[in-house]
């Protein structure tokens, strides 16, 4: 019998885990897709943001950017291809637990962005670096892959999800876990379930600790109130993916599929400012970046051609 968060940790990051065996985001030959894989414009918007923050921080040199959960390096590549004002000051650190993806990422970024340079402003690490710095920590769809503990409300108190031979096994939760669940969702009805996202909270604290001055920028799917989880079936907020399709039970064939959980933003430390990704991209000038293409398409409507 294995506690659910420990089971997911092994299924994703263990020796034979989903990410350890080379699974990744992407359009072809991958199991899921994230914003950097849909368009280079996402990286261009990140670059615009980095340029602005660099100016707000009075142009520090070095200006350190840490990307956690960097995967195959797609976002890092697009940032280097787009960044302007802070290009000479930027020192980029990709943090990725998967050995295969770290190798792919370093090769992708160096060959696409620094082919003719003997030294590159780039490092690839397995974990967040020690010490503090001035810059930005960013993470795109990282927190949803940090395994949660899962609780269920019953007449006798809170139970905690374990996995036993590919099936659910609910056990009485430790006192401290019951206390946390009751505080987070005091109105939960019997039979409803709730994630405790302790690993996400720890990661946020670690990321903030690395910043002497700067910003923490996180993109993820989630909800502003944990109460929302108790109003939805567990299968709606705890999901699996394989070959770009929903992939059924997370307890079967561990290591063969991605396991993801919506993020409860109210369980994260601090007072995060929350907005939709669409709103954030608009603030970084996405519409102005696509204005030429939009006008080209509209002008070609009467007689469409390849340029449109």
Please place each PLM-identified region on the residue numbering.
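A residue-level signal for conserved active-site and pocket-lining positions in enzyme catalytic cores
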Residues: 11, 137, 268
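Rossmann-like AdoMet
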Residues: 1-68, 72-128, 132-133, 279, ...
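Long, Lys/Arg- and hydrophobic-enriched amphipathic alpha-helices
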Residues: 181-308
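Generic detector of well-ordered alpha-helical packing
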Residues: 68, 97, 142-145, 221
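Conserved RecA-like P-loop NTPase ATPase core
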Residues: 42, 137, 220
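A mobile, often basic/glycine-rich helix-loop segment
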Residues: 136-185, 231-240
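Short catalytic/ligand-binding loop motif for oxyanion handling, primarily in non-cytosolic enzymes
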Residues: 75-76, 145-147, 225-228
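A short SAM/SAH-binding and catalytic strip from SAM-dependent methyltransferases
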Residues: 128, 132-155, 193-198, 202, ...
């Amino acid at each position: 019998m294995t506690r659910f968060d420990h089971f997911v940790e092994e299924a994703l990051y263990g020796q034979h885990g989903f990410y350890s065996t080379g699974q990744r985001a992407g359009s072809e030959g991958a199991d899921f897709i994230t914003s950097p894989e849909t368009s280079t414009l996402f990286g261009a918007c990140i670059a615009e943001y980095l340029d602005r923050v660099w100016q707000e921080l009075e142009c520090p040199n070095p200006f350190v950017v840490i990307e956690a959960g960097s995967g195959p390096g797609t976002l890092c590549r697009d940032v280097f291809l787009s960044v302007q004002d802070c290009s000479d000051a930027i020192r980029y650190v990709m943090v990725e637990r998967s050995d295969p993806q770290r190798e792919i990422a370093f090769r992708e970024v160096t060959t696409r962005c620094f082919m003719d340079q003997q030294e590159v402003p780039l490092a690839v690490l397995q974990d967040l670096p020690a010490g503090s710095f001035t810059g930005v920590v960013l993470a795109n769809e990282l927190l949803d892959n940090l395994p949660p503990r899962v609780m269920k409300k019953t007449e006798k108190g809170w139970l905690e999800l374990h996995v036993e031979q590919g099936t659910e096994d609910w056990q009485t939760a430790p006192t401290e876990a019951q206390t946390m669940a009751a505080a987070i969702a005091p109105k939960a009805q019997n039979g409803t379930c709730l994630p405790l996202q302790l690993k996400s909270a720890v990661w946020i604290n670690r990321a903030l600790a690395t910043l002497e001055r700067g910003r923490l920028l996180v993109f993820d799917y989630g909800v502003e109130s944990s109460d929302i989880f108790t109003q939805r079936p567990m299968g709606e907020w705890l999901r699996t993916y394989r070959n770009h399709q929903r992939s059924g039970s997370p307890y079967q064939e561990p290591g063969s599929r991605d396991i993801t959980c919506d993020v409860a933003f109210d369980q994260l430390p601090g007072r995060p400012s929350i907005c939709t990704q669409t709103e954030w991209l608009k603030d970084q000038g996405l519409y102005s970046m696509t204005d030429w293409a939009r006008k080209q398409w509209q002008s070609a409507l009467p007689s469409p051609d390849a340029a449109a």
